[in-house]
Amino acid sequence: CKPDMDLMFVSGVNHMFFHGTPYSPKEAKWPGWKFYASIDMSPTNNIWQDAPAFFEYITRCQSFLQMGKPDNDFLVYLPVYDMWQEQPGRLLLFSIHDMAKRAPKFIETVHTISNCGYDMDYISDNFVKSTRCVNGKLLTKGGTSYKAIIIPAVKLMPSEILGHLLKLAQAGATIIFTENYPQDVPGYGKLEARRKGFAQLQKQLPEIASFNETVATPYQKGIIITGNNYQSALEKSGVVPEEMKTRYGLQCIRRSHADGHHYFISS
């Protein structure tokens, strides 16, 4: 249980529930009534005698992880339109167990960023539109700040999102495009009109010879970084990676508070 719990803690979960524990009457034969989809936190589980110590560990950890605010380095744009386009067939159902098949490129991107020593949160279109730049940092609607936003090899992007990213850069934010600029709009509704507007926005992006070289281009008050190499591009942002991740192979999550920062660290 503890390794799984630690994985959830470093992933940002800070409030644990043992949900779905089934009722079992006293007269039920051992091991009692069970349900496959719930946790078996009951006297018939051999962890039961150690449960108080385990609960104390959870309480202490999540108490600290509920203090302060999240302090992850980057926002990563979720390329949902690319994911939808790349799926075979037309019926897409929610599936928590097939994400490696549904989003292999995005998963690889997330692991690459993490292995470079950084933490991130994902962001969708609606939250991008409500994000603003304050003192060079990205401030989301929920009040959490980030040092830059990463656009990971996105091919399809709505015009309003690309336009808002450019406005954020103009206001002082750092925008990182990896592998390529967005190339087209998603969907077919009013396609020609939307493509025309999208093309006008594309012309406002910095002209670069190739994504093979990492380039940081000043863009009014902000910076637009382009390149294929994540480590080089992220270094250009000026964000310092966590050495405990890059050098020692540890996993951690960082939170900020009035007096500084605190960490949860797992080996």
Task: Describe the residue ranges of each PLM region.
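Carbohydrate-binding surfaces of carbohydrate-active enzymes
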Residues: 1-267
